[in-house]
Design a protein with these regions (language model features):
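Bacterial Sec-dependent N-terminal signal peptides
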Residues: 1-26
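Noncatalytic luminal/extracellular "stalk/propeptide" segments of secretory-pathway proteins
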Residues: 23-26, 32, 52, 56-168
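N-terminal capping segment at the start of a domain
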Residues: 25, 29-65, 91, 208-213, ...
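Soluble metallo-hydrolase cores and metallopeptidase-like ectodomains found primarily
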Residues: 32-33, 107-109, 115-149, 214-296, ...
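Second-shell loop/turn segments in exported
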Residues: 34-42, 56-66, 103, 122, ...
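Short helix-loop-beta-strand segments that form the rim/entrance of peptidase-like active sites
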Residues: 49, 311-337
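Metal-dependent peptidase/peptidase-like ectodomains
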Residues: 111-113, 133, 223-226, 233-234, ...
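A conserved hydrophobic secondary-structure block that centers on an alpha-helix together
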Residues: 139-203
Length: 387
């Protein structure tokens, strides 16, 4: 079974378990109901066509872009076409553009010239022309923090911290390096650095650089920040290791820049509950993506998982007792303004959320769910397993 469909099915089964745990009549018919869910998804599914349109016809959809607005309009129209009550929830989002120039070269005092594969980090300032500086390598963010200003001043800092391959849960390995991407530029700038480069966050050694969000500390000079692909990071490390006395210079050119915040929207769709309409089960993913790809896994697949689950419920004329709300969040990648604004709105309106489910770990084969909550909440969730 293909993975996008199978995750939607898993989501639906879990989704309906939340409701059927309170509904004896539905428990009796749950086996047939779940079988009907599978039949609808496997024989008349819309998931892959919807994902194709989002990724191929709209494409990359970084917040503030024309494509992000196109995705919002597409999302609302899709929800309407599947029978949901829809609305747009206005938010203010960062507007950053990569620009058209992005180049990285390494030069050594022994005459080696190497073109590097890299990307500006989201939110970075540009280089204002060509930036040149001697490169200094640190094996970790902690090593950079311990460095003296005399070591760093006037140089471009390279933090070559790899993700921990021993972690079975790869998100833990990613989380261990997340501060590296977010904070290294300002830490380096505080010590007098003129630029910051990191090893891309990824476990494989490959030629594909990964962008991601970074943030500047107030009151600290803003210096250009970029990520180099892991394969090139290994090459740079080799130069330092094999010839520690040679000077290594990095040449950077980036014309990325930030603009004033833009108006954007979360997209909401609902199936009103028949009995507990004021108690809400929210399901969602994030509609935005980075600008260098199509956002198929992050988080196009999550958007489609949730959209397809709601489509199937409507197609089966399912009437929930609780209100089911589908949310396409905007601006998860570089600010999380969609999630934060939604949470504030829910609190101000004193809404009661019975449960919230998110899909944002790619479109691979589903392995289960993670849960954040109290011990009592986790115990209650585990009690649903037999259903």
């Amino acid at each position: 079974m293909n993975t996008t469909k199978s995750f939607s099915l898993l989501l639906l089964v879990f989704f309906c378990s939340l409701v059927s745990a309170q509904d004896k009549e539905m428990k009796t018919n749950s086996a047939k109901f779940i079988r009907d869910i599978y039949t609808e998804a496997l024989t008349r599914g819309h998931a892959y066509e919807d994902l194709r349109f989002l990724c191929k016809e709209i494409g990359a959809r970084i917040t503030g872009s024309t494509e992000a607005q196109m995705a919002i309009e597409w999302g609302q129209e899709k929800m309407k076409s599947y029978g949901l009550e829809t609305r747009l929830h206005e938010i203010q989002v960062p507007h950053w553009e990569r620009g058209t120039k992005e180049a990285f070269y390494l030069k050594t005092s022994r005459g080696t010239h190497l073109k590097l594969r890299g990307l500006a980090l989201g939110g970075s300032v540009g280089t204002n022309g060509t930036l040149r500086g001697n490169l200094i390598e640190f094996e970790s963010l902690e090593a950079l923090k311990e460095a003296t200003p005399e070591m760093v001043k006037g140089k471009i800092v390279f933090v070559n911290q790899a993700m921990d391959a021993k972690q079975i849960q790869t998100f833990k390995a990613y989380g261990g390096c997340y501060p590296l991407r977010g904070n290294s530029a300002s830490i380096a700038a505080e010590k007098g650095a003129i630029g910051s480069v990191i090893r891309s966050l990824g476990l494989a050694s490959d030629p594909h650089p990964h962008t991601g969000s970074m943030y500047y500390t107030d009151g600290v000079d803003k210096i250009p920040a970029a990520a180099i692909c892991t394969a090139d990071a290994d090459k740079i490390h080799g130069f330092f290791k094999n010839n520690p006395q040679q000077e290594i210079q990095l040449v950077m050119e980036m014309d990325c820049r930030s603009f004033p915040d833009a108006t954007s929207y979360n997209v909401l769709g609902e199936i009103k509950g028949s009995k507990y309409s004021d108690e809400i089960i929210t399901v969602g993913g994030h509609l935005d993506s980075w600008d260098t790809g199509e956002g198929a896994h992050d988080d196009g697949a999550g958007i489609i998982h949730c959209l397809e689950a709601f489509r199937i419920l409507k197609e089966m004329n399912y009437q929930p007792q609780h209100t089911l709300r589908l949310v396409f969040f905007m601006n998860e990648e570089n600010g999380n303004k969609g999630g934060k604004t939604y949470a504030k709105w829910v609190k101000e309106n004193e809404e009661k959320h019975f449960a919230a489910i998110e899909s944002d770990r790619g479109g691979f084969a589903p392995r289960g769910f993670t849960c954040d909550g109290s011990e009592e909440q986790v115990e209650w969730l585990n009690s649903l397993a037999p259903i």
